[in-house]
């Protein structure tokens, strides 16, 4: 492992990357192999987006959306996630919610409101955290930092298959356009832009299977 975590803190592996780079799947599989907890930080932004949408708030109303993030009523129970007492696992994966989440993720008030919630997931024996700023902002002292990249066309095809498998209608051209727009927002935002940490291992998963990518992360950890 490349770096030691802060003294007394549970070890963390961060897996950052753009939309549909496979970071969520990889994080869950690595966590399962190690017997660690997993943090899907994107789910918190999507839950904030869904809560704001339920209240009819436009994504441009930064103060109101930040207030929603501050008071977010969520509960994670294994593979299930509950928003205000209702299972929201299916709803937060809809593209409308994802696009809204990408917009509000640029707001400093939203990011600050969710920062400590994310850090609270750090518990023994360890945590695998996936997102966009896990290694740069949320867990800068992580023991291992991975930055997953993949060709945008490959990512759009991957997301299309995921949505169809879940019974959600999807159009590849629309997904490709949305993904390019989301990539631009994520990399160009003023607060915590999407970029690999200076000490991150950049891993291109375009030509790798899920199993090969998981093994590559585990190899980095055990090196």
From Swiss-Prot:
Keywords linked to the UniProt accession: ATP-binding, Cytoplasm, Kinase, Nucleotide-binding, Transferase
GO biological process: nucleobase-containing small molecule interconversion; pyrimidine nucleotide metabolic process
One of the record's GO molecular function terms: ATP binding
One Gene Ontology cellular component: cytosol
Binding site for ATP: 17-25
EC number: 2.7.4.25
Enzyme class: transferase
Catalysed reactions, semicolon-separated: CMP + ATP = CDP + ADP; dCMP + ATP = dCDP + ADP
Xref: InterPro entries: Cytidylate_kin, Cytidylate_kinase_dom, P-loop_NTPase
Location relative to the cell: Cytoplasm
Protein family membership: Belongs to the cytidylate kinase family. Type 1 subfamily.
The protein, known as: Cytidylate kinase
Protein species of origin: Bordetella parapertussis (strain 12822 / ATCC BAA-587 / NCTC 13253)
């Amino acid at each position: 492992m490349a770096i030691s975590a802060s003294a007394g803190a549970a070890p963390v592996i961060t897996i950052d990357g753009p939309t549909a780079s496979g970071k969520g799947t990889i994080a869950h599989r690595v966590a399962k192999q190690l017997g660690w907890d997993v943090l899907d930080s994107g789910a918190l932004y999507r839950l904030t987006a869904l809560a704001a949408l339920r209240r009819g708030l436009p994504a441009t109303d930064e103060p109101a959306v930040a207030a929603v993030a501050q008071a977010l009523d969520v509960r994670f129970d294994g593979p299930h996630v509950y928003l205000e007492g209702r299972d929201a696992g299916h709803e937060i994966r809809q593209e409308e919610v994802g696009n809204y989440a990408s917009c509000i993720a640029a707001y400093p008030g939203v990011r600050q409101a969710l920062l400590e919630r994310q850090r609270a997931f750090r518990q023994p024996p360890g945590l695998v955290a996936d997102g966009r700023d896990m290694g740069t902002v949320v867990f800068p002292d992580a023991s291992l930092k991975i930055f997953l990249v993949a060709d945008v066309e490959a990512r759009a095809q991957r997301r299309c298959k995921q949505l169809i498998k879940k019974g959600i209608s999807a159009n590849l051209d629309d997904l490709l356009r949305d993904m390019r727009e989301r990539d631009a927002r994520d990399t160009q935002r003023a607060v915590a832009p999407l970029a690999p940490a200076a000490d991150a291992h950049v891993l291109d998963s375009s030509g790798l299977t899920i199993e090969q990518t998981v093994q590559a992360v585990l190899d980095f950890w055990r090196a």
